[in-house]
């Protein structure tokens, strides 16, 4: 029986794109910071002149799938990370945005064969979002780890 797993040792050569929503940027900027910190500590060049990582900003989480699709189709990236924060309000808008963003991102990943990490916080309150973006822990770090693992796993199976 073969066991195939992603590793973190062989991930320093990965090419990564991060697609990040501007809406709720108090949260998404913190997620980006955690994400870049993790990638850097695992050997990815995150400097301004890096050819290993690109960051694309979109207006909100609803727009994450379309830009993820275009970036994945370029063939330049081995893994994408989407970052967003959707906080429940008094209208059904939350449900629509979360549903379409998650379905769209999953569809793009399946159709292109490029792993896309779903780093969209979906919380009931701003406090919950802040806790997940740095007050208690920074899930941006976790999303980057998932990207490293999936990027190396895809190399192992292809």
Curated annotation (Swiss-Prot):
GO cellular component: cytosol; riboflavin synthase complex
Catalytic activities: (2S)-2-hydroxy-3-oxobutyl phosphate + 5-amino-6-(D-ribitylamino)uracil = 6,7-dimethyl-8-(1-D-ribityl)lumazine + phosphate + 2 H2O + H(+)
Keyword Transferase set for record: yes
One Pfam family it belongs to: DMRL_synthase
Highest rank taxon of the organism: Bacteria
Binding-site list for (2S)-2-hydroxy-3-oxobutyl phosphate: 90-91, 132
EC number: 2.5.1.78
NCBIfam families: lumazine-synth
Family statement: Belongs to the DMRL synthase family.
Physiological role: Catalyzes the formation of 6,7-dimethyl-8-ribityllumazine by condensation of 5-amino-6-(D-ribitylamino)uracil with 3,4-dihydroxy-2-butanone 4-phosphate. This is the penultimate step in the biosynthesis of riboflavin.
Protein name (Swiss-Prot/TrEMBL): 6,7-dimethyl-8-ribityllumazine synthase
């Amino acid at each position: 029986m073969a066991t195939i797993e992603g590793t973190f040792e062989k991930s320093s050569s990965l090419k990564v794109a991060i697609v990040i929503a501007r809406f709720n940027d108090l949260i998404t900027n913190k997620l980006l910071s955690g994400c870049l910190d993790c990638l850097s500590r695992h050997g990815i060049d995150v400097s301004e002149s890096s050819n290993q990582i690109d960051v694309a900003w979109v207006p909100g989480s609803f727009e994450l799938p379309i830009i993820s699709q275009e970036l994945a189709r370029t063939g330049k990236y081995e893994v994408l990370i989407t970052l967003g924060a959707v906080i429940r309000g008094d209208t059904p808008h939350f449900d629509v945005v979360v549903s379409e963003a998650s379905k769209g991102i999953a569809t793009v990943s399946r159709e292109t064969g490029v792993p896309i990490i779903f780093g969209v916080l979906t919380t009931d309150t701003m406090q919950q979002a802040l806790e997940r973006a740095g007050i208690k822990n920074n899930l941006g770090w976790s999303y980057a780890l998932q990207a490293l693992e999936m990027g190396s796993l895809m190399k192992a199976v292809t």
